[in-house]
Amino acid sequence: MFRRLPFLIPIVVFTGALVAVAPLDAFAATSPNLGTALNFTALAGSTVTNTGPSVITGNLGLDPGSSVTGFPPGTVTGVTHISDAVALQAKNDLTTAYTDAANAPVTTDMTGLDLGGKNLTPGVYKFDSSAQLTGTLTLSGNGVYIFQIGSTLTTASNAVVQTINGAQACGVYWQVGSSATLGSATHFQGTLMALTSITMITGANIISGRAMARNGALTLASNHIVPPVGTCTLGSGGGGGNGGSGGAGGPGTVGTSGPVPVPATGAGGPGLLVPALMLIIGGASIEAARRSRAVAVR
């Protein structure tokens, strides 16, 4: 066939080259839309309980529960909203963000693996059941990271989530199907969204991120929770702001809403790659048909 249709060889080679250089992140995840929940560092559904000198940098919200205890000795630097319209809206927006994260197309199945010792690039990582972090998880590269966890998330003592090579905590999301427990002295990053509860053991810190328990309790013990600061810029495009930490006057300003796309890098992205492939394949088919007819006529 190729002796009759030698013109196909460079077409096939060129098409393969296009596919080879297509950026993997052209189809990457988008940030879940936190909406007004972006204004909160901590949210819970039933109760918020604290022991020790915990510090929540920013706003604290609770809805529909009404029990917030342990402040003082704990400190909330922003505003505490308990079962009011602001907390209700933030919880509704959290539900939307949680669903967005849960429905993101999976890029890697990590079921049964420990996150410790892994070096991951932007993507959507799925655990069918529980997930554990023992040691250090390294997130490398600017973009969106979503962890879909079917049941529980547990970190061991002294576990670390670190970001390098442009990775930002504002682009990291943990969607947990039941409850999350951060072990003592854990250094965690990202927005932690648990369907049920979040427990932070003594000395565990979220050094850049949020703790958001949709339906259950947030339990603290001498912890620090600090939201991402500055403008969240993912890839070469701009993401939404991280929102203010709030103050005596009310919650901070919501950053730009909507999912934040991770733009493709390199030549074309999907917007140019797919039409180019269609043109090449279509042209090859037409030329093949024309030459076949010419051979038949001879």
What are these regions (language model features)?
Residues A248-P275:
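Extracellular Ser/Thr-rich, low-complexity/disordered mucin-like segments
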Residues M1-F2, R293-R298:
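Actinobacteria-biased recognition of intrinsically disordered, low-complexity terminal regions
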Residues I9-A20:
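Bacterial N-terminal signal peptides
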Residues P270-R293:
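A cross-kingdom C-terminal cell-surface attachment/processing module
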Residues G123, T265-G266, G282-G283:
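Glycine-centered small-residue hotspots that permit tight backbone geometry or close packing
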Residues P23-G255:
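Solvent-exposed adhesion/ligand-recognition segments of exported proteins
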Residues F14-T15, L24-A28, G266, M278:
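N-terminal zymogen propeptides
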Residues M1-P10, G269:
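Bacterial N-terminal signal peptides that target proteins for export
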